[in-house]
């Protein structure tokens, strides 16, 4: 979803290295860079990657596709819930209510203690200056409770210290939403969900299997295949949403 806003595509080493050539020179993949051990052994290096991403996400303006989704919701007075594996906070930035979003891998805009010393999760208001040549942070955010290193509240690779409480609360809200709408007709619009980390694809397919009145629409430029009667649209997020919007406009005679 974020690629059409100008955010990098981390799928595959080449896409990651195009966005972060420093890691290509070091021979580090996305999984290598997104390893929580960096915060323990070399926090300036760990925060170099996540500090740069924090700054990038703060500066990024959500694309028109977010507005199209909002228009559909408003026009139809529709109930909705967003499930995302993105950690960039773009849905909140586009104006979607935080209590209607499930961030399955957490959010870069929230922090926790590296140990962790407690179960608190707090907003990330840190200003993180990063040396782009070395991808090392010039300052290290600290835990306000124990003065140890803090880290993003994101589920990383090989991560045993991530605090899931915030995501668990969102998951509970999503389950309540599904129970409330168990007999309703539901459209699941899955956008840009890959197979390497299939969390979102598995969720939409499970909903499509388990609920009789569900249509799943998969928008994906590469991995777009889906079993009938569900629908695939082989293109990027913005183009796919625009296609659906034009179709709905034609159906309504607008």
Located regions from the model:
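Conserved catalytic alpha/beta core of Sir2/sirtuin-type deacylases, generalized to analogous enzyme cores
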Residues: 1-254
């Amino acid at each position: 979803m974020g690629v059409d806003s100008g955010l990098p595509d981390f799928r595959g080493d080449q896409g990651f290295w195009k966005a972060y050539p420093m890691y290509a020179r070091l021979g580090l993949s996305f999984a290598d860079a997104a390893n929580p051990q960096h915060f323990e052994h070399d926090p300036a290096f760990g925060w170099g990657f996540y500090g740069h991403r924090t700054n990038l996400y703060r500066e990024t303006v959500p694309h028109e596709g977010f507005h199209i989704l909002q228009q559909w919701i408003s026009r139809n007075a529709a109930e909705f819930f967003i499930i995302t594996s993105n950690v960039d906070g773009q849905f909140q930035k586009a104006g979607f209510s935080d209590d209607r979003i499930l961030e399955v891998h957490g959010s870069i805009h929230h922090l926790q203690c590296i140990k962790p010393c407690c179960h608190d999760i707090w907003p990330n208001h840190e200003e993180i200056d990063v040396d782009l040549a070395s991808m090392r942070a010039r300052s290290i955010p600290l835990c306000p409770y124990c003065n140890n290193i803090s880290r993003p509240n994101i589920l990383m690779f090989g991560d045993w210290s991530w605090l899931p409480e915030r995501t668990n609360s969102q998951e509970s809200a999503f389950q309540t939403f599904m129970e409330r709408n168990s007999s309703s007709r539901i459209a699941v619009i899955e956008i840009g969900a890959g197979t390497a980390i299939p969390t979102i694809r598995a969720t939409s397919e499970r909903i499509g299997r388990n609920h009789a009145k569900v249509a799943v629409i998969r928008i994906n430029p590469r991995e777009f295949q889906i079993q009938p009667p569900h629908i695939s649209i082989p293109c990027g997020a913005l183009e796919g949403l625009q296609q659906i919007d034009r179709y709905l406009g034609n159906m309504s005679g607008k």
